[in-house]
Regions:
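Ribokinase/PfkB-type carbohydrate-kinase core domain
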Residues: 1-183
Length: 183
């Protein structure tokens, strides 16, 4: 299988990414002004608990020109691949124009939509209306449904219309596993 990672950012960050990838993965690079998001966590040595963290480069945004370069590159690549994986962490790929663009891949689009301490509650998966697979963790699903009390299996059943245009809905629960709903 051919796997291509589309990386947008500075050249110096590209080498950081390459260190962690299998050599068989091809990298297509688009130079943008964006830098890798860097999280610096401060941990108590005794309890091994995080005390706080600093986050750098989380406000990166594509310029209009950079955004168009990304769209053009993906349009050139898309015919060569059976699957498109989108990891939406609420950074540069989650702006309205790119979300709308990714909707054109609905038959082969797998989305993992996650929030983090920087954008918790602001990067919700319900901005995606259709695709092959959508995945999120339980707290993020609860944010979408605006319900923090009900049992998760009942919550999935009563809110099945939210993601019924996806073939599969995955709600992860960390070490407890996940729920998989087939539509």
């Amino acid at each position: 299988k051919n796997i291509t990672l589309l990386f947008c950012g500075e050249y110096k960050d590209l080498n950081t990414i390459k260190k962690y990838l299998n050599k068989d993965i091809k990298i297509t690079h688009i130079k943008t002004k964006n830098r890798l998001v860097k999280k610096i966590r401060y941990v108590d040595n005794y309890s091994n608990q995080r005390l706080f963290q600093n986050n750098l480069n989380e406000n990166n945004k594509f310029s209009t020109l950079e955004e168009q370069k990304v769209i053009n590159k993906i349009n050139k690549l898309k015919e060569y691949y059976d699957e498109v994986l989108l990891f939406d962490y609420g950074y540069v790929y989650s702006n309205d124009k790119l979300v709308k663009f990714f909707k054109s891949f609905s038959k082969k689009l797998t989305i993992n939509c996650q929030s983090n301490s920087y954008n918790f509650g602001f990067n919700l998966a319900d901005k995606y209306k259709s695709g092959k697979i959508i995945s999120m963790d339980e707290p993020e699903f609860r944010l979408v449904t605006r319900n923090k009390q009900d049992e998760i299996d009942n919550l999935i059943k009563t809110n099945s219309k939210l993601f019924d245009k996806f073939k599969y809905l995955i709600i992860t629960q960390g070490k407890k596993g996940c729920f998989l709903k087939k539509n």
